[in-house]
């Protein structure tokens, strides 16, 4: 694993048959908007993120993790606990698909500003470009959702939130950060979502240089939120992972290791590099 790096559709047949629904689903194809599961702090009690490595390969997901479905019209990505050189990790396989795993929690980013995780990507998605909504795919995403007062948001955002709630029965988080692996955009680039100002993507890795090796990434979520949204964050209410290729229709494999929030910046990883 590498030392952490800090800050410095094709439309389906069903959609063609119901164009109004297809148009609305296009708005929901925001790499995670349609259904994130429980996202209000009152409904969760888990103080931290359950480790994948605590389970045995082939077992069910650790307590707290749950499927994250974007739309019944989208093929889900396959997630499994597998052994990787003696360690249990999550393997993701996407085949023109999009779905994720989400873990609700309640955490104050001021107390736990550092987010650390591991991921591994074998190949990039050739046509992916997260600055273009019709090519918005990533082999790996680490997603952090924040609570807040939705009534404070601009009218356009509130209307978008209302539309999502009417269609899915789910309330969008007040704000969402997505850490992605981009093809070309420079490290630390902030990419705004095309439909709402409350979802921002941050390029945590870019290009081909580190493909095929485990990467350990550390981000200061507090600083990233301030930079992306220009305000102080509310509580962290969920963390998730997602591998998606629904817009490009490509096939991709990726792996995710444990995810942790920390009070202090972690030291260098014990394993500097691992294939």
Q: Where would I find each of the regions flagged by the language model?
A:
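C-terminal motif of bacterial Sec signal peptides marking the signal peptidase cleavage site
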Residues: 31-32
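Extracellular-facing segments of soluble proteins and assemblies that are Gly/Ser/Thr-biased and enriched
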Residues: 111-165
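Extracellular/luminal beta-rich ligand-recognition
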Residues: 137, 148-195
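Short carbohydrate-recognition loop motifs
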Residues: 77-99
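Secreted extracellular polysaccharide-interacting domains
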Residues: 91-111, 124-127, 196-204
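Extracellular carbohydrate-recognition regions
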Residues: 36-70, 155-160, 273
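Extracellular beta-strand ligand-recognition surfaces/modules
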Residues: 140-142, 197-207, 211-249
């Amino acid at each position: 694993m590498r030392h952490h790096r800090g800050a410095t559709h094709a439309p389906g047949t069903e959609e063609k048959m119901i164009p109004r629904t297809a148009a609305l689903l296009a708005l929901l194809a925001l790499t995670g908007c349609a259904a994130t599961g429980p996202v209000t702090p009152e409904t969760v009690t888990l103080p931290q993120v359950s480790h994948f490595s605590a389970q045995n390969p082939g077992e069910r997901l650790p307590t707290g993790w749950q499927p994250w479905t974007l739309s019944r019209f989208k093929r889900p990505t396959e997630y499994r606990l597998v052994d990787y050189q003696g360690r249990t990790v999550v393997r993701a396989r996407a085949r023109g698909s999009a779905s994720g795993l989400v873990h609700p929690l309640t955490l104050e980013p001021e107390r736990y500003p550092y987010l650390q995780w591991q991921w591994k990507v074998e190949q990039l998605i050739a046509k992916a470009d997260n600055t273009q909504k019709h090519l918005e795919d990533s082999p790996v995403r680490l997603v952090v959702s924040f609570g807040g007062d939705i009534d404070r948001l601009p009218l356009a955002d509130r209307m978008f939130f209302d539309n999502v709630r009417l269609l899915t029965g789910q309330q969008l988080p007040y704000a969402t950060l997505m850490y992605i692996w981009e093809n070309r955009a420079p490290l630390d680039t902030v990419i705004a979502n095309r439909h709402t100002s409350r979802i921002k993507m941050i390029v945590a890795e870019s290009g081909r240089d580190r493909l095929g090796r485990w990467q350990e990434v550390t981000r200061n979520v507090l600083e990233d939120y301030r930079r992306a949204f220009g305000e102080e964050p509310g509580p962290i209410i969920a963390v998730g992972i997602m591998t998606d290729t629904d817009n490009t229709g490509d096939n991709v494999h990726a792996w995710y290791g444990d995810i942790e929030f920390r009070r202090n910046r972690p030291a260098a990883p014990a394993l500097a590099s691992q294939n």
